[in-house]
Every structure is written in C-alpha cells, then in structure tokens.
UniProtKB/Swiss-Prot annotation:
Protein name per its UniProtKB record: Retinoblastoma-related protein
GO cellular component: chromatin; nucleus; transcription regulator complex
Region (Disordered): 884-905
Gene that this polypeptide is encoded by: RB
Family: Belongs to the retinoblastoma protein (RB) family.
Primary role: Regulator of biological processes that recruits a histone deacetylase to control gene transcription. May play a role in the entry into mitosis, negatively regulating the cell proliferation. Formation of stable complexes with geminiviridae replication-associated proteins may create a cellular environment which favors viral DNA replication.
Organism per entry: Oxybasis rubra (Red goosefoot)
Organismal lineage: Eukaryota, Viridiplantae, Streptophyta, Embryophyta, Tracheophyta
Length: 1012
C-alpha cells in the first residue's frame, strides 16, 4: 500500500512529517487502510451537536488509534527483539506528536474508539483482540507513570539542588526550575531500566515505588556532596541511626512507608544493571573512603567509583538511553522518558477515569457518591501513627496533601503489618466452624482456596520465554511476586471468613453453618474479593478489575453479595480499600449488572417473568461457573500437602450448590445485609439494641443471599429469594440515581435564569426522579447493555420538555461533564439494537445520546412522560427536532411514588447522648478543636488505634463524658507518680515548633504520619 492511499483519505496527512511510514510493514499498512475505510461511516456518525470536536480532530484521533491498533494487533507474537532489528521503531509518543495530539486527550478518546470499532477489530484480528490490544493496561500504566514521575521529582528536590548541576549554562529565558539536571535524568533512566529488566511483568505501583526509593538511595551515596540539600545528621530525614551512622535504607523506608526488604532487593537489582549496562565495577561501601558516605552506615551498601562524576555522567546517561531504546524499539508503547523532559506538552493536562485519577498527582475524593451512608465510616487513617521506641513522632508533624502514591504505600503497609503475620491456613476457630458442618469441609475449603489463588496469581510457565532484555531471573522475580500476593490474599480470606462465621453463628445461636460454608459461589466471591483488595493495594496494571471475576468464574453481581459483609467484618480495612470496594459496587449498579453475562439476569427471569423474552433475545444470561477441577487442570497448581478431594465434595461441585453450576438460570440473588439499615455512626448502646432487634426480625444475611432464587424468602410475604434480591438491588439503583439527579440539579441551578423559581427546580428534580423510578420498574429492558446515566440524561431532557423548562440537551451534557462519575462514552456511545426498532435497520450499533433518545427512549417511555402534562397534551413536544414518532398506546397506571429521598446534609448529626457526628474533614476539625479537648472527639479517618474505626472509640468517649470524676484534678507529687523527664519537656517544646513527640510515661498523642 502506498502513502498516497492515506493521503487521499486524509488530506491533512500530507503535512505530517512521516518517519519510516510510522514503522508499519506492508500488511500493517493494508490493515490500517482497511480499518480506516470501514470505520469512516462510524467516524461521520461520531460528529454530534453535543460535542465540540471538529471532523479533522476526530480524524486525527482515529488515525492515531488505528496506527496503535494496527501495530499492536498486527505485530508478531513470536520471536524476540533481534528479529527485524534492522528496522527503525517508532513510539506511540512520536505518532501522537506527528498528528498533533497529546497523551491525555488520546486516552480520553481511546475508550470511545474501542467501543465504536470493536466489531471491525474482532473480524480482522479475532475475538481476543481487546486482550491483545491492552488499551486499559496502557492507560493505567500512563497514569501510574505520571504519578511516579511527580513522586520522584518531589523526593529528588527534597534531597538535592536543582540548579548548578550541569556544566552547560541554561538559556537566559529559561528559569533554573525548568532545567533538567543530568543527575535527575540519570535516576529516572535507572528506574526505567529496573522496570524493563527487573519487574517486566508485574509493573504495579507499589513495586515501582520501591524501585524509586532504591534509586534514591543510590543517588544519595553517589551524587557529589556539594549538591546536597541535607546533612546525614538531619533528624527528620534520617531517623534510623546506629553507632556507625545513619541506616540509609531503613530511614528512607521509614520516611516513604516502603518495605525495607523490598527496597534492598531492588537495590541489588539496580546494582546488577549498573554492572551489566554501564560496566562499572562495584565495591563494598565499607572499604571506600569518600565524602558521600560520611555519617552513613556503609554495611550492605555498594559503591561504584566514578559513577556520577562529571567525566562519566554523560556517558552513563547515553548508555542507559541506548539500553532503553533497544527495549522499546518495536513495541509502539509510551516512551517513558517523556515524563522527565522539559517540554511536557505531549503529556497534556486534565484527568482520566472520570475524574477519579488526576494527572496532577493529587487525589480527588468523590464526595457525592452513593455509599456515604451505607458504609459505617472510613475506618482508617491515610497514614498510620508510627512511633519511635522512645515515643517521639517520626518526621515533621505537618499535614501534607495525600497523593495516590503515598496512599498506596500506606495501604501496602497495612498488608505488611496486619495481614502478612497471619497464618496461611484456617485458624483454630475457623477450623471449628468448618468441622461443625454436616461433614468436615476443612480440606475442601483449603483446596479450593489454593486452586483459585493459583488461577488469579499464576506462576510463569516453566517454558515461558523471558521478555527481550529482561534479566535471566526475571521469571523467578515474577513468581516470587505472585507467591507473595497469593499468601496475602489467602490470609485475608481466612481472616474475614472467620469473622463472618462468628457473626452468623451468633445470629443463629449455632455453629453449624453448612448452608453457607458448602456454597461454592460464596467461597469464590470471598476469594475474589480478597484477591481484588490485594491487587488494588498494589495497583497492578496487568490485573485490572474485572480480571478477578474472569479468573474465578463469577460475575460482578455475585461479588456484590459479599462486598458489604466483607467491609463490615474487617475492622482494620484501610479507608482507600473501602472506597475501592464501594466504587466497584457503584460500577456494578450503574452498568456492569446490566451487561451481557450478568447473573442478575438469571434472577430477573424469576423475579420478573415478563422480562425473560427480552433477556433471552439479547442473550444476557450468565454462563455456568467453570468446574473447580477444570480450573485446576488449566493452571500449574502444586497440590503437594493438600488432601484429595472427597467424593462427596466432587458430587457437590458437579451438581453445584443450589444448582449454581449446572443451571445458570438458578443463579444466586442479592441479599439484605444484617447491618445495611444502620446509621453511619451509632453509639454502642444503640448498636446492641439494633442487633437484638435484627436477631429477631432479620433472616441470616449471607445464607439467604446465596440461597436458591426460587426458594421462598425467609422474610415472609410470599416472595421468592430472587424477588427479594431484585427489589433490594433496584432500591440501591434508585438511591444512586437520586444522588446523581440531585448533583445535576445543583449544578443546573447556577445556569438558571432569574425568572425560574426554586419551586420549579424542586419540581424538576422530583419529576426526573419519579420518571426514572417508573422507567426502572416498567421499562426495565431499556437498561439492558446500557449505563443508568444514559437513562437519567434522557429523563432529564424529556421531563424538561414536558414541564416547559428551558433546558437544552447540550446544557444537560455540559453539566453532566462536571459530575465526578462522568465518562464521555456515556453520551457518545449508547447501545441500540435496530432489529427491534421501527426503523428499517438491522444489527446492533452504538449511537450518540440524542439518536438514542429519539429512536429508542421516546417511543418506549412517551406515555410515561405524558403523565406529567395535562391529559398528555405535551407528548408532541418531547422530541428533539431531528425526528418524530407516532404516539404509543395508553400508559398503564403508575404506582404512587414516594417523594425525592432525603440525602445526607452537612450539619452535625446527633447519634447518641453527648455524641455528635460532624461532616467536617479532619483537617478542619484540627483547626477548631483544641489539643486539650481532642480526646473527647472521634474524627473521621482518625482513631486512637491505627486502621481502626473512630466508632470503636465511642464507648470510651461516652464513658469519659458521663464519668463523675473530675477531668482536671490537682497535680500529684507523690513518689510513685513519676517525675517529668527532661526529654518530655524538650519534646513538648519540639511539638510547639510543628513536631510532635510522646514519651512512655504519658499516653501517646494522636499523630499522623506526613505524606511524601
């Protein structure tokens, strides 16, 4: 294929400096031309009146995506980097620069093209094209590198000067802060070498952060001392000291919440790379006499002569550049060196993932999420109160902005501190529950857990080829990583399973939990939830959700059955992991439960038989869970030491507990958690009253959740478990919709005209909510394969037209863009099946929100919207001018609906005598509460114990408030009272200067570790 073929399609491409024809061979060019030609009609339909993108801009985005897809999907899957080494590669960054795009904008549009061109890619490259394309992994990798580069920059600037480090003088118009230090660039290149060679498969955020800290340690002992901003005697920076000097690695790990063992391991890998790539000879630091090692303990440190001297630094950088070029030359991935370049215009600005991840590096908290009430509280601080042996607080007591990297490291510290020390087998108490079933199921539980964890965290195959350029033992490193993650997830699974069993046993007043503990789906959900939390802690790029669902054979709807119970039965679970589970449940409610293959549909055909035809027509039913033995046969699982599967268990796995495996139509349904009705914060007395009441009225939560959907609900009323579960599930969706509708109304208020009254705004909110509620119950099929926000947006416009509210669809979309959950594909790509529409079209497609509104939404819900107007007189005005439709039949009677649900406000809430809950963030609470009265408050995210809910302190607070003893008594100078030491006085003075300290003779102060 010639370039003229592309020039004829894209005239603007003639002005693009084409380097080696974008590194595509003839077949790739042919595929690219075919892909672009077949996608051109889709491209023309993509120009929507609600967007501002010009046709040429869309062509540039599509051309960049097609280049990336053709290169990624058309590349050979065999061979190594030596094949075709005579060709010149081109990175994704170079392609985007050629077509005048940046990375952030490219990744924002990437999901749109994946959906639009997906069917064409499937025909050209096979059904597994999306897995091979690795678009989600590439985007997550970009976000992680953006965060890591800023993390590295902050750390470097804290230790080293950023000016007067290069021989060349910067241009007069360039500030010193804009110049890039050669030492700074060397550190980033060494980190990239670690990423390429040492941990090539699992590039998770925690492992990468450990790598950055190891590189920082190498820089500290090699960068000339004249460029330091610190002294080795500085207490805030280097807290770990011994007689021979500062323990460098331990001090850095203390400061950055990293694992000392992992950082030492990374330093060994980095030293190997310096030896192999830079050809520098290592020597023991204890044998070297250099200014850089003064006051630093040299034990276990390696020093390289002339590594970062002025004479050798340029050559070292050049060699690292060549090594990186060789590693990425033909992959078409991101050139990760762009993150430390002076000109970062290629990076772009803004946020990805609907605002959940911000490229600026600062965490954005979605304050208007659904589950602010249903979760008892954020149970752990972002930073745990690590203390010295003598009680002195480590570091400077300054509340710093939490970043995604520092938060991930704090969460990883929770795994090391609370989960890793646990046994990797059932505890004696859990064994008691397993043995108390109708038969002893201990061996079955252990074997299942082993197989599932091996499926989620597999070892590298023995014959698996190492990635080109990797160190010889990189597969061994990957296997060690997988083994560590398996153990963490396994220990967490056993821990939470025990607490759940204890709660169920107390509720039933019996230890026989056969119905629950013999349910295969329940255990897989628990294992998947544990593994997902471990993956979320490490921010693993190659195992993004819903990977754990695919590995375990369950669906997102199944996982939702244990999310609430999992959170409530693990008190030490950090705040970020609770938010992660809540976000997963929100994703389930808004879209994943409505996708093809969701087990919710298996319950819907029982709870709502009228929907069975539509569910079968769209092929939505979930596939059966794979057999456990079949999963074991497809993974390399070592069963040494594990008992064989009993015959009774084999029969159960074949038949499936409650028909789970054999018949997908009898899938388990949603459940009502024992504690779901609890307030966000309650007093211990109220807790006991609620628990006593629910023990009498509420059936066992988990057992009923995983019961057969055709079984009558234990709650009575003649409902089946499927009906009860669907009703509860729909109520959660309605609540989520109410939160989002309210957010839209609040943002619309800023744009309204003065003539429109508050009453009209309230009426709009009420009507949109009521219409959504009715549509969910009477037009449920509109939600299949769609996002609930698409229905909300259409309901907004339809109600606005009926109510003669001056609001255009463009204004609705512009305000929706400001919502924290906004994703462009929600209003750009809406699923439609033309086979069942009135138009003479066939097949399935994705259209913009306006086309969906006119062609599908209005014909279905027009009678429901007409109820708002006088005798349905406004039916003709509810269409966008692009099309008109005939009237439907009369609308069936709608049930009387409750008013718009009350949402949490920002006023302090009294939850018990003398106890109020304030919504203020802890940073504002600190400014309002004096030090002397802090012990009377439980602040959100803080507690007297690390990773514990503040609600656990309410008993102590009540006792303190209701105590008759005087709080302030006379000073006791008795001999057994203990004297105030000089160190306490010194530490108290140190506290006044912005630091905090405690002593063993006084109760520890509530402190918070500073972020990095």
């Amino acid at each position: 294929m010639k370039m003229e073929d592309l020039f004829s399609l894209l005239p603007w491409l003639r002005d693009v400096p084409v380097q080696n024809q974008f590194s595509l061979d003839d077949k790739m060019y042919s595929d690219a031309l075919k892909l672009f030609t077949e996608s051109k009609s889709i491209l023309s339909n993509n120009v929507s009146p609600i967007g501002s993108t010009t046709p040429e801009e869309l062509e540039r985005y599509m051309f960049a995506f097609i280049l990336y897809a053709s290169k990624r999907l058309g590349a050979k899957t065999t061979g190594d980097a030596s094949e075709g080494s005579n060709q010149s590669g081109i990175t994704l960054c170079q392609k985007l620069k050629a077509v005048k795009l940046n990375l952030v904008d490219f990744f924002k549009e990437l999901p749109q093209f994946v959906v639009k061109i997906g069917p064409i890619l499937s025909d050209m490259y096979g059904a597994d094209w999306e897995k091979r394309l690795e678009a989600k992994e590439l985007q997550a990798n970009f976000v992680h590198l953006s965060l890591l580069s800023k993390y590295y920059k902050r750390a470097y600037q804290e230790f080293f000067k950023t000016n007067e480090v290069d021989k060349e003088v910067a241009d007069p118009g360039t500030s010193s802060s804009d110049s890039i230090s050669d030492y700074y660039r060397f550190g980033w290149l060494l980190f990239l070498a670690l990423r390429v060679h040492a941990f090539s498969r699992f590039k998770d955020l925690v492992t990468c952060t450990n790598g950055i800290v190891s590189v920082l340690a190498i820089l500290i002992i090699h960068i000339p001392a004249r460029l330091r901003k610190f002294s080795a005697l500085d207490l805030p920076l280097f807290e770990k000291k011994i007689d021979r000097g500062v323990n460098l690695v331990a001090s850095l790990c203390q400061k950055y919440d990293t694992s000392e063992d992992e950082v030492k391991h990374m330093m060994e890998k980095a030293n190997e790379l310096i030896l192999e790539i830079l050809k520098k000879n290592p020597c023991s630091a204890s044998l070297c006499k250099t200014e850089n090692l003064e006051n630093i303990d040299p034990d276990d440190l390696t020093y390289f002569e002339d590594l970062l001297e002025d004479s050798s630094l340029p050559n070292c950088i050049s060699m690292l550049e060549k090594d990186y070029d060789a590693a990425i030359w033909n992959k078409g991935d991101i050139d990760e060196r762009v993150f430390v370049n002076v000109d970062d215009s290629l990076l772009g600005s803004g946020s990805l993932s609907g605002g959940a991840i911000n490229i600026s590096g600062l965490r954005e908290i979605r304050c208007n999420g659904l589950f602010n009430e249903t979760i008892a509280s954020p149970l752990s601080p972002c930073r745990s109160p690590a203390l010295h042996v003598n009680g002195a607080r480590g570091g400077v007591n300054i509340r710093m902005i939490s970043t995604p990297v520092s938060t991930a490291m704090t969460t990883a510290k929770w795994l090391r501190t609370y989960i890793s020390p646990l046994p990797s087998k059932p505890s004696p108490q859990l064994e008691k529950y397993l043995m108390s079933c109708d038969r002893n199921i201990s061996s079955e539980v252990v074997r299942r857990a082993h197989i599932i964890m091996e499926a989620i965290f597999p070892n590298s195959a023995l014959g698996e080829r190492c990635i080109a350029g990797s160190l010889p033992n990189s597969n061994l490193t990957d296997n060690i990583w997988a083994q560590q993650r398996r153990l963490e997830a396994l220990k967490l699974y056993y821990r939470v399973l025990e607490t759940m069993c204890t709660a169920e046993a107390q509720l039933l007043h019996a230890n026989n939990l056969t119905s629950l503990l013999t349910n295969e789906r329940f255990h897989r959900c628990m294992l998947a939830c544990s593994a997902e939390l471990v993956l979320a802690t490490h921010k693993t790029v190659t195992m993004l959700f819903p990977a754990v669902l695919e590995k375990t054979g369950i669906t997102a709807f199944d996982l939702s059955k244990v999310i609430e119970s999992f959170i409530r039965h693990e008190d030490s679970l950090p705040r970020e992991l609770r938010r992660h589970l809540n976000s997963l449940e929100e994703r389930l409610l808004e879209s994943m439960a409505w996708e093809k293959g969701s087990s919710m549909d298996n319950s819907l055909i029982i709870a709502r038989p009228a929907l069975s035809a539509g569910i079968n027509r769209f092929g939505l039913l979930a596939e059966p869970m794979p057999f456990l033995n079949a999963m074991a046969a497809h993974i390399e699982v070592s069963t040494g030491g594990l008992p064989p599967l009993p015959s009774s268990c084999k029969h159960e796995f074949a038949a499936g507990q409650n028909g789970d495996i054999r018949s997908p139509k009898r899938a388990c349904t949603e459940y009502r958690s024992v504690l779901v009705e609890r307030n966000s914060f309650t007093s211990p007395v109220k807790d006991r009253l609620i628990n006593n009441l629910k023990q009498k009225l509420t059936p066992p939560a988990l057992q009923s959740a995983f019961a057969s959907p055709t079984r009558l609900s234990p709650g009575g009323g003649g409902e089946t478990c499927a009906e009860t579960g669907i009703n509860i599930f729909f109520s959660k969706i309605v609540k989520l919709a109410a939160v989002r509708i309210n957010g839209m109304i609040e943002r619309l208020e800023k744009l309204e005209k003065q003539s429109q009254t508050q009453q009209l705004r309230e009426q709009l909110r009420e009507n949109v909510y009521c219409r959504f509620h009715i549509i969910l119950n009477q037009r449920t099929s509109l939600f299949f394969n769609r996002h609930i926000d698409q229905i909300i947006l259409c309901a907004f416009y339809g109600v606005a037209k009926i109510s003669q509210y001056e609001l255009t669809f463009k204004e609705i979309i512009l305000n929706y863009r400001k919502q924290p959950q906004c994703k462009p594909q929600v209003f750009r790509s809406v699923f439609v099946d033309w086979s069942f529409s009135r138009r003479n079209r066939q097949g399935q497609d994705h259209v913009d929100i306006i086309t969906f509104y006119n062609e599908v939404f209005i014909p279905s819900v027009k009678p429901l919207l007409g109820e708002l107007g006088p005798q349905g007189a406004c039916v003709k005005t509810d269409l966008i001018p692009e099309s008109n439709n005939d009237k439907d039949g009369q609308c069936p009677g709608s049930p009387k609906l409750s008013t718009f649900p009350s949402l949490p406000d920002m006023s302090p809430k009294k939850v018990a005598k003398n106890v109020y809950v304030s919504p203020l963030r802890s940073s504002k609470m600190d400014a309002l509460i004096s030090n002397s009265s802090k012990s009377y408050y439980a602040c959100v995210g803080e507690s007297t114990h690390a990773f514990q809910s503040p609600s656990k302190d309410l008993t102590a607070i009540n006792d303190r408030l209701n105590s008759t003893s005087k709080v302030r008594g006379a000073l006791n100078f008795d001999t057994d009272a203990g004297l105030v030491s000089d160190s306490l006085v010194a530490n108290s003075l140190y506290l006044q200067n912005g630091n905090c300290a405690t002593t063993s003779s006084v109760g520890p102060l509530k402190t918070e570790q500073p972020d990095s």
